[in-house]
Amino acid sequence: KEQIWKGETRIPDEIFLDNVVFHRVNTEGITSCRPLFYAQLQERVAGKQMEAAILETNYWCAEEATYQATDDRTISAEAVYRNGIGRCGEESVFTVNALRSIGIPARQVYAHRWAHCDDNHAWGEVWCEGTWHFLGACEPEEILDLGWFVNASSRSMMINSRIFGSQQADGDVIEHPDVTSGVNQLSRYAKTVDLELFVTEEDGTPVADAEVSFELLNYAELVAISRKKTDANGKVVLRTGKGSLFVSVWKEDRHVTAILDTREISAQTLVLAGKKAEKSAEEFLI
């Protein structure tokens, strides 16, 4: 990293290892694409300061690939380059790999589902001048921290990055389904609320290790944006946006649900009282 960015030797080793050296961005196919991208970008970014090199790299990405919706598994960064097309998740995989190929820490972030409409989006973040900044992948702007999704992301209930294995999270872990973990990055984009949820028995005894799913209505289905377990005090905390969430809590054969508006409340107690959740009909505020 000293050879490429002489003025950026302050990049922490952990960030460099996790967001430059590491080979994977998300669930994409893996090929040896970095030497190919480096050969294309080396002269183009030579002599530039780090931020200017980031912006120039994104211009190159826009020249090489454009958006096209797909439904298959996320293709490799090299496949996006050779095909010239990819959905937002694939464009961001491509852009992150291009940036990593020239020694710039980069990662993918995404809103798994928007709160205000039926859709989602993924983009990139880069480490520059001591902090993380965002950019639209293959959607170049003249400055960092600007993109068409700025207003949309400000209404989000969750935006997250992904880490693998023993990599250290730089925020609250919102789910840990397998060898990967989702990390909450929402505070960079939206006003947030720390929603405290307490799960108790009917007599008020805290329920430890209850499964809690925080869900968002999108495409006529409830989609989990975070899954956690209650602690020994029956408590779980989620940093989220301002809007409506469907919360589902269960332990063994007991289950309770609720719809919470985080614009009005920041704490709620739910009681595990029965074997099945009662059906309810309420409005979601988006």
Describe each region flagged by the PLM.
Residues 1-48:
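Linear, non-domain "peripheral" regions
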Residues 39-59, 64, 68-78, 82-175, ...:
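Hydrophobic/aromatic-rich core segments of domains that either
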Residues 188-190, 270-285:
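Conserved "repeat-terminator" motif of extracellular CCP/Sushi domains
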Residues 193-203, 282-285:
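A short, amphipathic beta-strand motif
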Residues 202-221, 242-243, 286:
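Short, ordered, surface-exposed loop/turn motifs in non-cytosolic proteins
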Residues 218-240:
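Short, acidic Ser/Thr/Gly-rich low-complexity loop/linker segments typical of extracellular
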Residues 243-254:
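A short, solvent-exposed beta-strand micro-motif common in secreted/extracellular proteins
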Residues 252-277:
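Structured interaction patches on ligand/partner-binding surfaces of diverse proteins
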